[in-house]
């Protein structure tokens, strides 16, 4: 391994052990750093210590020429600034060339969410029969929409995480932070109907584990597997616009705020470390209010 490769690995270890970043987040950092190293190799720059502010400006120009979105460019800058801050802390460099790099302010991109008619179509798919995998998909949809948890968090739910007496689930979120989220009667009924079928399937394939959600072989359902299941549900519902599974989380937050929930509660339910991450949904609800007004008021 080269010296540069060792520095990269030390940084990734730091993100995992000291910052408690998830594998997905660490991988995003790694990809951004490797892309920058590719650029440095093309510029005949062999060491991170040799990078100057001018080199960084050239790199940013290249990113813009490749038509990366503002969000992607901002993320790459943030990743590399963090990496060089780490190198500075480790006395590998004496100055961070990313310190004074600015970027165009990100355009506000409102989260997309499902409309009520679309949610009804999704639920019709998972209530069409009582086959084991349909029951599982019913749990999947009821839990994701009913709690607002991330797909990756849903994949990690164990039977021991369910507290049926309080109708709450222990969730392990980003940075291994734990929180309890409540679930409603629909999710509770879906889980109850599913558990006996889950047991039968696991006995058939001689599986023993505590994961709530399983695939057709009785193995734990992965994050990728959940996305695949949701994509199939969305396809069966014949929804025409471009949509993605994470919209269930957006829909959860938007529906809560539209129906009067306070911001702090929604923040806690979503597991957001900062209130600013939750405030994006207020823009969605304002758009909802405006569109409703424009549609229904006679003087709009």
Swiss-Prot record:
One MF annotation (Gene Ontology) recorded for this entry: DNA binding
Pfam families per record: Phage_int_SAM_1, Phage_integrase
Entry keyword Cell cycle: yes
Tyr recombinase domain boundaries: 109-294
CDD domains: INT_XerDC_C (cd00798)
Keyword presence, Cell division: yes
Subcellular location: Cytoplasm
Highest taxon listed in the record's lineage: Bacteria
Transmembrane stretches, start-end: none
Descriptive protein name: Tyrosine recombinase XerC
């Amino acid at each position: 391994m080269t010296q540069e490769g060792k520095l990269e690995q030390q940084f990734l270890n730091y993100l995992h052990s000291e910052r408690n970043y998830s594998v997905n987040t660490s991988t995003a950092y790694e990809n951004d750093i490797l892309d920058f190293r590719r650029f440095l190799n093309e510029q005949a720059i062999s060491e991170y210590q040799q990078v100057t502010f001018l080199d960084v400006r050239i790199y940013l120009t290249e990113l813009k020429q490749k038509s990366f979105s503002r969000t992607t460019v901002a993320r790459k800058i943030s990743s590399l600034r963090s990496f060089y801050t780490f190198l500075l802390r480790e006395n590998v460099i004496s100055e961070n060339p990313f310190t004074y790099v600015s970027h165009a302010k990100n355009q506000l991109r409102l989260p997309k969410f499902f409309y009520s008619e679309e949610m009804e179509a999704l639920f019709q798919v998972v209530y069409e029969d009582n086959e084991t995998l349909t029951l599982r998909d019913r749990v999947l949809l009821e839990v994701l929409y009913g709690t607002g948890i991330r797909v990756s968090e849903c994949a990690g739910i164990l039977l021991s995480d369910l507290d049926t007496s309080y109708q709450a689930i222990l969730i392990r979120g980003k940075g291994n932070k734990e929180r309890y989220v409540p679930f409603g009667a629909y999710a509770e009924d879906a889980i109850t109907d599913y558990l006996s079928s889950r047991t039968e399937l696991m006995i058939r394939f001689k599986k023993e584990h505590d994961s709530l959600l399983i695939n057709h072989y009785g193995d734990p359902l992965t994050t990728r597997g959940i996305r695949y299941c949701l994509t199939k549900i969305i396809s069966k519902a014949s929804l025409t616009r471009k949509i993605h599974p994470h919209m269930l989380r957006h829909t959860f937050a938007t529906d809560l705020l539209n129906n009067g929930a306070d911001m702090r509660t929604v923040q806690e339910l979503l597991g957001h470390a900062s209130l600013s991450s939750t405030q994006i949904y207020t823009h969605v609800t304002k758009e909802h209010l405006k569109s409703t007004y424009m549609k229904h008021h006679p003087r709009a």
